[in-house]
Amino acid sequence: MTKKRKRQHDFQKVKLKVGKKKPKLQNATPTNFKTKTIHLPEQLKEDGTLPTNNRKLNIKDLLSQMHHYNAGVKQSALLGLKDLLSQYPFIIDAHLSNILSEVTAVFTDKDANVRLAAVQLLQFLAPKIRAEQISPFFPLVSAHLSSAMTHITEGIQEDSLKVLDILLEQYPALITGRSSILLKNFVELISHQQLSKGLINRDRSQSWILSVNPNRRLTSQQWRLKVLVRLSKFLQALADGSSRLRESEGLQEQKENPHATSNSIFINWKEHANDQQHIQVYENGGSQPNVSSQFRLRYLVGGLSGVDEGLSSTENLKGFIEIIIPLLIECWVEAVPPQLATPVGNGIEREPLQVMQQVLNIISLLWKLSKQQDETHKLESWLRKNYLIDFKHHFMSRFPYVLKEITKHKRKEPNKSIKHCTVLSNNIDHLLLNLTLSDIMVSLANASTLQKDCSWIEMIRKFVTETLEDGSRLNSKQLNRLLGVSWRLMQIQPNREDTETLIKAVYTLYQQRGLILPVRTLLLKFFSKIYQTEELRSCRFRYRSKVLSRWLAGLPLQLAHLGSRNPELSTQLIDIIHTAAARANKELLKSLQATALRIYDPQEGAVVVLPADSQQRLVQLVYFLPSLPADLLSRLSRCCIMGRLSSSLAAMLIGILHMRSSFSGWKYSAKDWLMSDVDYFSFLFSTLTGFSKEELTWLQSLRGVPHVIQTQLSPVLLYLTDLDQFLHHWDVTEAVFHSLLVIPARSQNFDILQSAISKHLVGLTVIPDSTAGCVFGVICKLLDHTCVVSETLLPFLASCCYSLLYFLLTIEKGEAEHLRKRDKLWGVCVSILALLPRVLRLMLQSLRVNRVGPEELPVVGQLLRLLLQHAPLRTHMLTNAILVQQIIKNITTLKSGSVQEQWLTDLHYCFNVYITGHPQGPSALATVY
């Protein structure tokens, strides 16, 4: 076979017959095996030192991926970082520097998804990082933010505003500390600087013009609106921070801050005299510094020359105003072009009105910053000189502005379209826009320029008056502007008729029902400010507004109606009433006198339902009441003894009434005392008893209940009060004791007291334990050698004394509530027996043991033993030795048939030691015993 034939044989094509399978090749791969899928949800890498997320990546791995060239990897790293930090928050503190440096670096990333993930991560981190922690790294954060705001890419600029929102919300003080750079960035976001040679010699106000970028996905007006909203927020934070700083330094009074509070110092002279209360008059006084000081060190960048003054400098503020005001006017003209202006009263569409609102907000905040620095009013004159003409021309030409509502009709979903239209119209507050404009304009006017500005001032006055009188519901922001404009109008035009018209319009709004708390609070502060301003004027130039007098006269009745339904508002009413009462306002005092019975009602009055601070102010108001009739004193007594007032406030009230009485020592004529002595003593006695006449009458019907202690030797039953009521009554009685002790002619005072006890308490069969103890206490305090005790009072005292002693000796160990009464009641019982030996003798004579049951006999024996052992009573027991011996003999006779118990043995022992063994005793007792 030739070579050619061999070659053809090697490459000969195999012919297949129909119906037969193709033979398998020698190197064919078998495919008859089965496969299973292997799923790897996590990587096998593990790190025992650092926590990892679900992908087993730790913080270092995720931060290293932030430098990857692929946008998807960086986005995944940011999402993984958020997941890791949410699971392990402690990582934030340990790696805060690295986290901030890497996250802020992607603010200018070219990929939108990466920037979105960075913003979301920053929004997650910001609430978890305190300002003190982030402050060392804030220059880096601010630098990246500034780079993003001035970037040439439109998307990066838009996302930078989202970052700014987060920083303004969480760290307003830190972000406003970089105001010099950021304010310039705001200007560059909406404008550009003209660089032509002809503008070199012009001022800086004419070198900036609004910029238009056709490549942006938003319209120029929409973009400017976004920037102006952020600029308004930034200036608001700057103004708030500057106001707080100046207030902490004491450079100006607190003015328009609704959250401003002033804390008064309450001095208890009794504690102060005993060195129990330290009075610190000044905030930073004393040896220890004030730990809540607002002082903070500023960060120095490049030495002292690098300190960011921002708008705190007058020159910097004027420079920024010169740049931004012309741009804001251009935005206004663009939103409301003069050539397309419609007649006054026609509406403006939604988006232009939003731009106008932000323009006015920014100007208003700049005016607020200027007022904080303008101590000599030079800046105010400069603002009026440069911008009043432009403002009148552009702003006041179509004043007031209204919103044009555009209803979008849809056939399929009519309800949805109407709802959508309502939402759009509600997003715009054209009333607030007009009020902001009015506030800006009236701030440029003063009394000296009133004739020049009378035309547009009259427009504003008319608008303000109509807004107040139309009865529309205003929110707190609208009302704050409205009242600010009204106050400024009253200052620059102090005309009585115009002022009265404005006050009357505000009072019309005040009389509306259902006003929310912030609105009612602002109205109260406004009227209070007017009243205080009028009071500061001399009597020669003082003008008493009739509307203001009517408002003051209605405050006590409002307080009585309001009660505890709104404690905050009630507190504000009380403060205003207290201020006017201290200044002896006749209308208010007359109204307060007429409403006093409702305010000081012991059941539902404001004095018992409000918090303790308000109760204290109401108690102090009692001092200013023109008269204190008997029915009012009766209610005040009930307030003291019911426990609705604390014991300290009740003591303060008793002290105030003493100062109003004729026993205070003031040298006034008798006609000046508008509280009779009889009513005053009635008040003291009612407070001393601790129970009203009706309650004592109701107690007489109680029998066989656990709270009533009944003995077989005393006609007086004892009602056991609760421990809280007992302690409160005891503390209040101390103040009554003090008031009675300082009254001269003690014997007459004692006669009045014992006659009251004989009239109202003697003859009762059920007496509260606190009442009996307090009666004993006041008798011990007042009794001296000049006092003569009534014969009708002695048996009552003896019966009450035995009932109290029986109660004290029968208290079981498990009754912890009554055990705390033991020392107080035992002390007054021993004192009354030591001071009045006749009471002791009457009590011993009432111990007829032959009428006593077997359960009460050991109590009598224990009582006699304790009386014998008590040293102050030993002399009196010797005097009544025969009577005591007879009682012991009767007890021994009754117990002769049984085994002698231990208590009886102890009684015989004490008698033999203290009576029989006395040097004067045995000879006298030998014939009897």
Swiss-Prot record:
Output the InterPro entries linked to this UniProt entry: ARM-like, ARM-type_fold, HEAT_type_2, Ipi1_N
Taxonomically, the superkingdom here is Eukaryota
The protein's location, in the record's own words, is: Nucleus, Nucleoplasm; Cytoplasm; Nucleus, Nucleolus
Q: What is its main location?
A: nucleus
Question: Which keywords, in A-to-Z order, does the entry hold?
Answer: Cytoplasm, Nucleus, Phosphoprotein
Q: Which GO terms describe its cellular component?
A: mitochondrion; MLL1 complex; nucleolus; nucleoplasm; nucleus
Q: What Gene3D superfamilies does this protein's entry cite?
A: Leucine-rich Repeat Variant
Q: Which residues form a coiled coil?
A: none
Q: Which residues carry this modification: Phosphothreonine?
A: 29
Q: Does the keyword Nucleus apply?
A: yes
Q: Which stretches are HEAT repeats?
A: 99-137
Regions crossing the membrane: none
Subunit and partners: Component of some MLL1/MLL complex, at least composed of the core components KMT2A/MLL1, ASH2L, HCFC1/HCF1, WDR5 and RBBP5, as well as the facultative components BACC1, CHD8, E2F6, HSP70, INO80C, KANSL1, LAS1L, MAX, MCRS1, MGA, KAT8/MOF, PELP1, PHF20, PRP31, RING2, RUVB1/TIP49A, RUVB2/TIP49B, SENP3, TAF1, TAF4, TAF6, TAF7, TAF9 and TEX10. Component of the 5FMC complex, at least composed of PELP1, LAS1L, TEX10, WDR18 and SENP3; the complex interacts with methylated CHTOP and ZNF148. Component of the PELP1 complex, composed of at least PELP1, TEX10 and WDR18.
| Its biological purpose | Functions as a component of the Five Friends of Methylated CHTOP (5FMC) complex; the 5FMC complex is recruited to ZNF148 by methylated CHTOP, leading to desumoylation of ZNF148 and subsequent transactivation of ZNF148 target genes. Component of the PELP1 complex involved in the nucleolar steps of 28S rRNA maturation and the subsequent nucleoplasmic transit of the pre-60S ribosomal subunit.
Question: Which family, according to the similarity comment?
Answer: Belongs to the IPI1/TEX10 family.
What this protein is called in its record is Testis-expressed protein 10
What is the native source organism of this protein?
Answer: Homo sapiens (Human)
